[in-house]
Design a protein with these regions (language model features):
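Asp-based, Mg2+/Mn2+-dependent phosphohydrolase catalytic module
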Residues: 1-15, 25, 82, 104-108, ...
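N-terminal helical cap/lid subdomain that shapes the substrate entry/recognition surface
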Residues: 3-102, 108, 121-124
Length: 212
């Protein structure tokens, strides 16, 4: 059977990963009672229902560490958190972030790899805690770059630093709205579900097998 016409096959030469809900998930016994609030606070874009706060300010939280802290403390206080400051510190603490079972293997493809995240703190410590920081070539973080996903600029930055054209990169994330922005610059995009780590054993590897 002949190949379909006008189909372009591109070799993937680099992989871009989202952080929260893709490679790692905020999970800790002390946070179990606040699962709904955790989902709202770690959503990559948008303002979750029930968070009484200025949407414009919330959208900019991942561009400035001080604003990130202030906004989260305000939300936590309104949600009735007993100690908002400690709660916020836990959200930014490596021990509270757990890797998915296939994270280490997914980061070991030998292709150039970047983590592209809407975040306002240095997540490299999370990777270091689990011994995989050396498997990431570039951390492209919104608060350092001045752009948040789905802005195409942040994906271009990641591809430029890895030395590949966007059409040669695969973006893997958990949000079609945020991570799907990579398609605007030509990246291939795959979305995984941000399930609890114990419920998603090899979604990353399944995606990688489709493309690499």
């Amino acid at each position: 059977m002949s190949e379909p016409r006008n189909v372009r096959y591109v070799t993937i030469r680099a992989v871009l990963f989202d952080f929260s809900g893709t490679l790692f998930r905020l999970e800790h016994d002390s946070l179990a009672a606040h699962a709904g609030l955790m989902r709202a606070l770690t959503a990559p874009v948008g303002l979750a229902d029930g968070l009484d706060i200025d949407p414009a300010q919330w959208e900019r939280r991942d561009l400035d560490p001080d604003a990130h802290r202030d906004m989260h403390l305000a939300v936590l206080a309104k949600a009735g958190a007993k100690d908002p400051a400690k709660f916020y510190a836990d959200l930014c603490s490596p021990p509270f972030w757990q890797p998915y079972p296939d994270t280490a293997q997914a980061l070991g493809t030998e292709l150039p790899t970047a983590v592209v995240s809407n975040i306002a703190w240095d997540i490299s410590a999370v990777f270091a805690r689990h011994g995989v920081e050396n498997r990431v070539d570039e951390f492209v973080l919104s608060y350092q770059e001045g752009f948040v996903k789905p802005d195409p600029k942040i994906f271009r930055i990641a591809c430029d630093r890895l030395g590949v054209h966007p059409t040669e990169a695969l973006m893997i994330g958990d949000s079609a709205e945020a991570d799907g922005g990579a398609a605007a610059v030509g990246c291939q995009v795959e979305i995984v579900e941000p399930l609890p780590t114990g419920s998603r054993p090899e979604a990353l590897l399944q995606v990688l097998r489709k493309h690499i």
